[in-house]
């Protein structure tokens, strides 16, 4: 899912996860505690990165837990282009501002037309392509928090 030379993969300082991240490619995560990430389930979660390759823990079903055999890969460098998964809320268009869909609460993204951002919520970046609900689009990872 990562694209070309503009992408960057974290040299896995993240060594614990708070849930099964298998098949969560294109979803947003936030830093929950030191060296530990969790799916961003609402727009107030401070952006950490986008999952490129998901994984489970070494003890599936028990969380927090150490990352499993497969590596967890994320794009977390500002300005990188990454594919993200659009929520069930509706389609997005190129140039839409994307944020975590607080209704689906599963790390997927929606635009500000489908969910108006409130103070303290985060825009994660701009859509670079069009996509329908449940599809993927390209997004430039450029988080910005909404101020008063």
Label each region the model flagged.
Residues 1-148:
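Surface-exposed, low-hydrophobicity beta-strand/loop segments enriched in small/polar/acidic residues
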């Amino acid at each position: 899912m990562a694209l070309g030379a503009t992408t960057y993969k974290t040299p896995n300082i993240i060594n614990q996860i708070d849930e099964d991240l298998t098949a969560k490619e294109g979803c947003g995560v936030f830093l929950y505690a030191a060296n530990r990430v969790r799916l961003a389930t609402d727009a107030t979660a401070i952006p950490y990165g986008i999952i490129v390759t998901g994984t489970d823990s070494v003890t599936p079903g028990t969380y927090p837990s150490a990352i499993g055999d497969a590596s967890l890969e994320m794009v977390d460098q500002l300005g990188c282009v990454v594919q993200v998964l659009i929520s069930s809320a509706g389609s997005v268009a190129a140039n839409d501002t994307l944020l975590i869909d607080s209704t689906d609460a599963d790390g997927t993204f929606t635009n500000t037309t489908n969910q108006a951002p409130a103070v303290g919520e985060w825009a994660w970046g701009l859509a670079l392509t069009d996509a329908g609900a449940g599809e993927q689009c390209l997004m430039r990872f450029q988080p910005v928090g909404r101020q008063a």
